[in-house]
Structure formats: structure tokens, C-alpha cells
């Protein structure tokens, strides 16, 4: 049985950060310092994830990134040489689609974090709006994060890396992972490059999938062979969770995602 790669990363103390590489995020390059003002670096219990600031007090990430003593770092580019406007917060409250925090490979891998206090917009910090419409298959999408830059071993970069991939038909992911019996319909998006070589990987969980400028997905899971041919990754579909997100932010903290019988 193929072991599925869950994108959250367990940091090992002996790991050293890569200074330079020709194989970032898997197939990308160092992000422009000004293109990821909304990108959060989420850490807890030695784990690393990404996240997306959606307003001054709320961050979206993946449910499987949940942990104790969560810290959310904003305004980060280089982890070794922090920006002067870097701001760090802790998770005041964490909300899940279901109170038990249950999620599957194809549903409910989403977590909404309320920060202990608001962040201020600055040169390197600004929220990303929620999507106004669902994405279309064929869209060009941007992925980013501080995840491993090697498909064969964990090498964590000092700076985030970015790459463009394509939004694929969900059926492509169903065909790629037959052993998991993915349902015919899902609240997840399938994205990658069929020829391989560009992908999220270990440590990129919870980071954004931005399609045609809109925040459409949250990095969830994929093949252990990051960037492998015809093995794209899956992303929680933000648009399908808008009612839940907006209800929680408005104060209806008992809101749950509607049940869908796949």
C-alpha cells in the first residue's frame, strides 16, 4: 500500500536549512519578497505548516496542522534574518468543521485560527480576500511555502518558494489514487503538473493555492513522491466553506460545515 504524504512536517533537530537550491518547493524558485504578505508560518510541537491571513485576526490552514502551543508568524521571508515588521501571535481559538476534528483525505481538512490579538498591516503583512467565485479547471494556480525543496529527503529552505501549477479535473486525482476510493464528488481541488516536477511537499501543508489571483485552496495531501508524474496533490476547496468561515468570524462559533453524503 502506498503511504500517502501528509504535507505537515515533523522538524528534526539535526536538519539544517538549505541556503540555495535549484529544486525549490519542488520545481519552483524563491518567492518575490512582496508577493506573500498574507502567508503565515505556523509552528507547533516541532511541526511546520503554512497558513493564510484572511483578516487582521484570522488565519486559515489545514485541520491536520493542529497542535499544542501553536505560533503564527506573519511578515516572514527569511527565517534566519527576520523582517523588522515580523509579528508573532498564538492561537487564541481554533475552529474545525466538526467538533471532533475528524477529517478525511477528501473532506473537512480545514482549520480557522483566531489570533490572540490582531496584526497590523505593514510592508510585509496584509490579508488575502476570500474568493468571490469558484475556480475553473485549467486555471493557473500559485503555490508557496517553506516546505522541503527535495522530493527524496527533507531539506527545509530559509525562505519560501513559489511555483505555478494547473487546476486539474478532480477525476485526475481519483484515478491517481485508486487504492483510497475517493468519492465521485468532493470539497477538494486537484492541482499539479501532469508531467511532474512541480508540487507542494512536506512542510507546505495549510498553505494557499491561489488561482487567477483568488485564494481557492488549502494544501492538504498528496503522493509521498512529491512532484511525481500523474500524481497531483489535493487542496481543501475554500469556496465551498465560505458560509462556515463567515459564520465563525461573525460570532456563530457553533457553526459546522453542512453534511454532504458523498
From Swiss-Prot:
Q: Does the keyword Secreted apply?
A: yes
User: What residues does the Peptidase S1 domain cover?
Assistant: 25-250
Q: Where is the signal peptide?
A: 1-18
Q: Which UniProt keywords apply?
A: Disulfide bond, Glycoprotein, Hemostasis impairing toxin, Hydrolase, Protease, Secreted, Serine protease, Signal, Toxin, Zymogen
Picking any one GO molecular function of the record gives: serine-type endopeptidase activity
Tissues with expression: Expressed by the venom gland.
Q: Which residues are glycosylated?
A: 102, 169
Q: Where does it localize?
A: Secreted
Q: What's one GO BP annotation on this UniProt entry?
A: proteolysis
Cleaved propeptide residues: 19-24
Q: Where are the disulfide bridges?
A: 31-162, 49-65, 97-257, 141-211, 173-190, 201-226
GO CC aspect terms: extracellular region; secretory granule
Question: What general EC class does the enzyme of this chain belong to?
Answer: hydrolase
Entry-linked Pfam families: Trypsin (PF00089)
Disulfide bond as a keyword?
yes
The record's subunit annotation is: Monomer.
Q: What does this protein do?
A: Snake venom serine protease that may act in the hemostasis system of the prey.
Please state which protein family the record places this protein in.
Belongs to the peptidase S1 family. Snake venom subfamily.
The protein here is known as Snake venom serine protease catroxase-1
Amino acid at each position: 500500500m502506498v503511504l500517502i504524504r501528509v504535507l505537515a512536517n515533523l522538524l528534526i533537530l539535526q536538519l539544517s536549512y538549505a541556503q540555495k537550491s535549484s529544486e525549490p518547493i519542488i520545481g519552483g524558485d524563491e518567492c518575490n519578497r512582496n508577493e506573500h504578505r498574507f502567508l503565515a508560518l505556523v509552528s507547533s510541537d516541532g511541526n511546520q505548516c503554512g497558513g493564510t491571513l484572511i483578516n487582521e485576526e484570522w488565519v486559515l490552514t489545514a485541520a491536520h496542522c493542529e497542535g499544542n502551543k501553536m505560533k503564527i508568524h506573519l511578515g516572514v521571508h527569511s527565517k534566519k534574518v527576520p523582517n523588522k515588521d515580523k509579528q508573532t501571535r498564538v492561537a487564541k481559538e481554533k475552529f474545525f468543521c466538526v467538533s471532533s476534528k475528524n477529517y478525511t483525505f477528501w473532506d473537512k481538512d480545514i482549520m480557522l485560527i483566531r489570533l490572540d490579538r490582531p496584526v497590523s498591516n505593514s510592508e510585509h503583512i496584509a490579508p488575502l480576500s476570500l474568493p468571490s467565485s469558484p475556480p475553473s479547471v485549467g486555471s493557473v494556480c500559485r503555490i508557496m511555502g517553506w516546505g522541503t525543496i527535495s522530493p527524496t529527503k527533507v531539506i527545509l529552505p530559509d525562505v519560501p518558494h513559489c511555483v505555478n501549477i494547473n487546476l486539474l479535473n478532480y477525476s485526475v486525482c481519483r484515478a491517481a489514487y485508486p487504492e483510497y476510493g475517493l468519492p465521485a464528488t468532493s470539497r477538494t481541488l486537484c492541482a499539479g503538473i501532469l508531467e511532474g516536477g512541480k508540487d507542494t511537499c512536506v512542510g507546505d501543508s495549510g498553505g494557499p493555492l491561489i488561482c487567477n489571483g483568488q485564494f481557492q485552496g488549502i494544501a492538504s495531501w498528496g503522493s509521498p513522491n512529491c512532484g511525481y508524474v500523474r500524481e497531483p496533490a489535493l487542496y481543501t476547496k475554500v469556496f465551498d466553506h465560505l458560509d462556515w468561515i463567515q459564520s465563525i468570524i461573525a460570532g456563530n462559533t457553533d457553526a459546522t460545515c453542512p453534511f454532504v453524503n458523498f
